């Protein structure tokens, strides 16, 4: 019974998150067992420090929280200054509805606030991002076993070009595609989420692959993949309060920007992040948090991935009926 409860709790935690912030693919919060849910997730991602330089997850003079838009400066080149950074902040409204016990529909509406600082020139743009719609099917659902419980979810979805992709500097120059609130392209993605629990211990493995289209300027981002591994332990404070600490690691890969189908090498992402997570459950409410820092990244001429922070709040409904039996 404890193992079953552990799997159910994990399904509503942010510990099943997997992400690629540059390419716009970010999955989870996964829901309470067959219960519809809604919530808000704030995620912060930073890139700081060229090859050979130290890194900070919160670069000097940057902000963890959203800041006022400022587009006084045109896109700038990279000259290796330690003060250079890119910061991506996203606030997401998330909803999930179970049509049937094994079939779920998901909606993510993001609002972006992106900042970059190059050559001592700081720019921030923001706005509604690209909306994600996706469906997941619970291929394996064994939650009533005495020793080991498992769940496997497979899904697919679309990222719609709802975000502005035309932001320009005061000089009339268009900012690069990944820095925009939207990519201007319709993209598709597939994912798998496997969770296993043994008594109070458990692990979650997530994998996603994203097929990126072109926008009107024939810009795109190369197809991307993300893998996320999370090992966790459930602590029962009392009947109403559960706490799940976790150790997390993720691997992200994309060859970066493309123009007219050709790879430019700009914003190439090939890195490993590791860190910790903490999820707290009080009745139907889930509070999630995580922090990851750079463990390894490929050599590029851009600031390297330095870290990620997420904060989430989810309410899980007491769903008794389904549209499809």
Feature names for model-found ranges:
Residues 51, 59-78, 218-325:
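Outer membrane beta-barrel transmembrane domains
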